[in-house]
Amino acid sequence: MKRSFLLLLTILTIFIILGQGVMGNDEQLRGNRCFQIKFKTGKCVPKECQTACQEKLRKPKLKGEGFCMKECTCCFYT
């Protein structure tokens, strides 16, 4: 009885640690690699946002995506 409880507790602990690691990596990939692009008009047009994002990322040769929320947000991936 005691061994099965310890085994169950060990497996549960490993599962929680691995789960937190996977969720942390996903958040780190999206959250830290996004930045805002401001336009003179103050309005975000999706096509202009995508073009501006690709222009900003052209020099370091990164792949990214621009999308509109309230402002143009550019996220890139390595």
Curated annotation (Swiss-Prot):
<feature type="disulfide bond">
    <location>
        <begin position="53"/>
        <end position="74"/>
    </location>
</feature>
<dbReference type="GO" id="GO:0031640">
    <property type="term" value="P:killing of cells of another organism"/>
</dbReference>
<feature type="disulfide bond">
    <location>
        <begin position="49"/>
        <end position="72"/>
    </location>
</feature>
<protein>
    <recommendedName>
        <fullName>Putative defensin-like protein 133</fullName>
    </recommendedName>
</protein>
<dbReference type="GO" id="GO:0050832">
    <property type="term" value="P:defense response to fungus"/>
</dbReference>
<keyword id="KW-1015">Disulfide bond</keyword>
<keyword id="KW-0295">Fungicide</keyword>
<keyword id="KW-0929">Antimicrobial</keyword>
<keyword id="KW-0611">Plant defense</keyword>
<keyword id="KW-0732">Signal</keyword>
<dbReference type="GO" id="GO:0005576">
    <property type="term" value="C:extracellular region"/>
</dbReference>
<feature type="signal peptide">
    <location>
        <begin position="1"/>
        <end position="24"/>
    </location>
</feature>
<feature type="disulfide bond">
    <location>
        <begin position="44"/>
        <end position="68"/>
    </location>
</feature>
<keyword id="KW-0964">Secreted</keyword>
<comment type="similarity">
    <text>Belongs to the DEFL family.</text>
</comment>
<feature type="disulfide bond">
    <location>
        <begin position="34"/>
        <end position="75"/>
    </location>
</feature>
<dbReference type="InterPro" id="IPR010851">
    <property type="entry name" value="DEFL"/>
</dbReference>
